[in-house]
Curated annotation (Swiss-Prot):
Record's comment on post-translational modification: The most abundant glycoforms are characterized by an O-linked disaccharide galactose linked to N-acetylgalactosamine (Gal-GalNAc), further modified with up to 3 sialic acid residues. Less abundant glycoforms are characterized by more complex and fucosylated glycan moieties. O-glycosylated on Thr-92 with a core 1 or possibly core 8 glycan.
Record's function text: Component of triglyceride-rich very low density lipoproteins (VLDL) and high density lipoproteins (HDL) in plasma. Plays a multifaceted role in triglyceride homeostasis. Intracellularly, promotes hepatic very low density lipoprotein 1 (VLDL1) assembly and secretion; extracellularly, attenuates hydrolysis and clearance of triglyceride-rich lipoproteins (TRLs). Impairs the lipolysis of TRLs by inhibiting lipoprotein lipase and the hepatic uptake of TRLs by remnant receptors.
Keyword Signal included in the entry's annotation: yes
Single GO term (MF): lipase inhibitor activity
Protein family: Belongs to the apolipoprotein C3 family.
Listed GO CC annotations: chylomicron; intermediate-density lipoprotein particle; spherical high-density lipoprotein particle; very-low-density lipoprotein particle
Swiss-Prot/TrEMBL site (May interact with the LDL receptor) positions: 41
Pfam families registered for this protein in UniProt: Apo-CIII
Protein name according to UniProt: Apolipoprotein C-III
Modified residues (Methionine sulfoxide): 63
Signal sequence extent: 1-23
Residues bearing attached sugar chains per UniProt: 92
Region called Lipid-binding, residue ranges: 68-96
Upper lineage: Eukaryota, Metazoa, Chordata, Craniata, Vertebrata
Length: 96
């Protein structure tokens, strides 16, 4: 009777072993999916940070160009206005 009991125990162990392997595979699969999800999130965050940095740099460049253009325009306008003002306020000679 003992050999039958040993055979039955071995048979039950063989039945349980695939279930344990499936559980480990599922656990491994879950870990890999979690790792891939975290890696994807990290990559997206890094890309977003780079894009925000590029957008910020473009905005700074645009503002610098705009202020430079405005400064040039103001200098030109001021020069013309100053010339006009000086000619309008300069004393004119009256005819003799």
């Amino acid at each position: 009777m003992q050999p039958r009991l040993l055979l039955l125990a071995a048979f039950l162990a063989l039945l349980v072993l695939p279930e344990a392997t499936k559980a480990e595979e599922g656990s491994l699969l879950d870990k890999m999916q979690g790792y891939v999800k975290e890696a994807t999130k990290t990559a997206k965050d890094a890309l977003s940070s780079v894009q925000e940095s590029q957008v910020a740099q473009q905005a700074r460049d645009w503002m610098t160009e705009s202020f430079s253009s405005l400064k040039d325009y103001w200098s030109s306008f001021k020069g013309k206005f100053t010339d006009f003002w000086e000619s309008a306020t300069s004393p004119t000679q009256s005819p003799p």
